[in-house]
Amino acid sequence: MTISPVIRLHPDDGVLIARASLPPGTSVADGVTTVERIPSGHKVAIKPIAVGEPVIRYGQIIGFATIPIAPGQHVHVQNIGMGDFAKDYAYCADVKPTPNFDLPATFEGIRRPDGRVATRNYIGILTSVNCSAHVASLVADVFKKNPFTGDNPLADFPNVDGVVALTHKTGCGMTQNEPLALLRRTLGGYARHVNFSHVIVLGLGCEVNQIGGLMEEQKLAGRLRAMDIQEVGGTRKTVEAGIAFVREALADSNKVRRETVPASELTVALQCGGSDGYSGVSANPALGAASDLIVRHGGTVILSETPETYGAEHLLTRRAVSREVGEKLVDLMRWWDEYTAREGAEMNANPSPGNKAGGLTTILEKSLGAMAKAGTTNLVEVLRYAEPVTKKGFVFMDTPGYDPVAATGQVAGGANLVCFTTGRGSVFGCKPAPSIKLATNTAMYKRMEEDMDVNCGTILEGEESVEECGQRIFDLILKTASGQPTKSESFDFGGAEFAPWVLGATM
């Protein structure tokens, strides 16, 4: 079977997507041939587009022509710009019943004493402030596995996935309002995270983010051990006390056993980074198909990255289960508009140089592709950054577009697994929630196979459908939740990627 050199995503589209680099003279539609080289994953016009006329992809506006565009021309930053247009939020218009499966899927999870289910079993070392970061790392390093030498200090504790220090750059020199509340919400979410069997929090002692205040505000009494370096007596004594805590915790943590649990215990963070022109064609829709399966099995998926939903939010408000939920999302978009304007920026500055090299032109185009990760089910809730996820189904969390910051908020909210799509090639990893990475195209997958878990480029090559790839992703999610290591786990990624959102002035 001959595969077309281009991909049409919607009957109304005025552009097609190149499956591979197309030389001039390539036939792409009836009576239309390329007049210049079209890079892989980029757009080619199939009809004349006048100045100011909308450019349509996915059946939606992705920008407006800044100069006349002829059929066969490359459509990108040289001839598309942003512009205002009316959006019909049509709250709740597309809400529909979500049919659940009669026989729920299962995985082998770790049932905690409080009934929650973990996918991993870590011991965590958190810090209240950057000033205690090095001490936390010194403690964790004693128990650190080396993926290159094979050294494993935890060999006698096979049911413990690791000891991880999650450090950050703030905790002091900050205002005691929303910035402090946001940090405490994040740390509280990690302290309660189901994938931690035991947690210790290390502070310096004089910081704004006092451990006592953190524990009181987040109701953490009895959940963790706390130490201040100044009170314990300095670096060496604190490190020794931290090591003693971990050694004591290891024996208890190793007692866990996996058991068969329903897929409804999954809370999956949906992420993308290093996106390209194929993201909205292959990996994101396939992850969306897997997301629908998770929701239909009673589980939860979390979409985030508010700036990368900008311009496509009207498609989500149609799926909101209530006007109140939909209006929460619209309010977030207005906040981000005002926030970026105060900083002298604009939302369309979001696409990175790598995004543009991969074929993405505007934030509207990027958002429409990114939104595909969330599938087709109803939007049941909209949350602030790092707020606990308490509802089953598809939820949205307000986060920046920067992947580590976004994922940190999702995991703080309770995600026990992350699915991360990438077109350019991200090496993101996460702890304590494992991260599955999905490649949008086969060329990148082969180039970075040691870092990629799933090749979704098979969709572009006609080897499988979006739904078939989505089923493959769902099956891998169940295996990963059951303990099968991801590619990022093989390199021990995940500690350095803890990145709480920092708001406000540093003083």
Which ranges hold each PLM region?
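Short secondary-structure boundary segments
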Residues: 422
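Metallocofactor- and cofactor-centric catalytic cores in central/energy metabolism, strongly enriched
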Residues: 1-417, 426-428, 432-507
